Amino acid sequence: MEQAVYRPARKLCLAKHLMLATIGLASALGPAGFGMIVTASEVRAQAPLGTSYDPSALLDRARKKIGSTTRRLLKCTCLETIERSYYAPSEKVNANVMTENPTNSCDAKEFGGNGPLSLEVKDRLRLGVTVLGDKEIYSWAAASRFDSRSVFQIVSSGPIHMGSFGTYLPDIFENPGTRITFAGKKNEGSGEVFEYTFEVPAKASHYSVGTENAWRITGYHGSFQIYAATAELARLVEETEQLPPEAGMCRTRSRFDYHYMLIGDDEFLIPRESRVDTLSGTANETSSIITFSDCREYTAESSLRFEAEEPAATVKPGSQVPALLPAGLSLTLALSGSIDPATAAAGDAVSAKVSTAVRAPHSNQILVPAGAIAHGRILQMQHQYRSNRFLISIRFDTLEANGVVTPLSLQWDRELKAEKAITQVPLRSRGTEFSLPPPQTGETGGVFSLSATKAAYLPAGLKSKWITVNP
């Protein structure tokens, strides 16, 4: 039998952007075998006398199923969609005069218990996710290969969570330090479930909180439900202990509702929906709803590819398109397809057609022919509720012309205004506006801002003017 090696499971990482710190739940697959969590007698002791079921045996069956499916996640990749909501107190949370606690203190702060909240911002992300070795790896949904960077570098703002795909489960079910107690049984819509509570103390936890200079271990606790008939995990709920002040938040809590998804010829235990909430000392809260779709299984011929392996450009010998366009060229781009703020997400692919040929300065040489296609992705899809605006940040990074793909670095043309939008449904209010990119996009890219109405969208054919810059 292969020797079991227990690996660190989770990380919660600090990165101050937007309204709250970034969260990372980085998990490992853990050992190939299972160790006892609690003894059978300890679990049975919690069951009422006279019952015919065995909570310990059911738990053992469930653990084996969980371990099998988490290891098999190495063969799968899915699209992960994250919808994040940011809330702030409707009224200012003042310091406690009696205790002299500062307004950003975590003392007495509870989820939903600090007065009415106001929805400030919503955004949406779409990522590719798979498991490599003992961790989850990610890419933007539009990417042709996985990114060699961490998810915290890919998504530079807001709360982002690693582990929702399932790699965090070994830290609960394969951790010898986890204390599990049978809590009873109940009837759910899908049948009878057994409920257990668990606690992972800090001394046994692999859940760490990252600050700018160090990592801090935190304990956590929660409960889970197992279907009595099938020994399948139905739901898991957890909450961290109070986090250290340098974490930038007080606590996080998570809820995972599970189902088995048919991927290829096999079934895999994947969350139907996950919800991860954060609470800050200022009583701000965030809620992230995570779902998985378009899952597929790698075949024997498949292999993972990373961005670092991709050449910077695929330029054919003798091509008339230069390998790198000089700075200062003006391009008018027309969107190839519409972008609907109700469904679009950061990570989605976008493309636009070059409307007019671009010539070399002081020359008739055509550097970019009309009809060439600029490819890129959405970097931010945000709904700002106070201003009632949609903000859609886009960056184009490659240009395809005559079968040749070259790198492309663009920013808004600062001197020329965008041309009037071509639209079948007019944009309401102030219409479509254009601005420089947000800080996390760097110097390239731009932001479309439009009134947040039901009919609002960026239509196919929408033209905007850009200028080439040095990468």
Name every feature range the model reports, one short phrase each.
Residues A234-L236, Q320-P471:
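Contiguous beta-sheet cores, especially beta-hairpins with glycine/small-residue-rich turns
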Residues L12-P31:
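Sec-dependent N-terminal signal peptides
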Residues M1-A15:
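N-terminal secretory signal peptides that target proteins for export/translocation
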Residues K185, Q225-I226, T398-L399:
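Hydrophobic beta-strand positions
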Residues H221-A228, R359-A360:
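Active-site and channel-lining beta-strand-loop segments
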Residues V43-Y220, A229-A234, T240-S254, H259-L324, ...:
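Structured extracytoplasmic
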Residues L29-Q46:
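Signal peptide processing junction and immediate N-terminal pro/mature segment
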Residues F224-I226, E238, V368:
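Extended non-catalytic domains of envelope/secretory-pathway proteins
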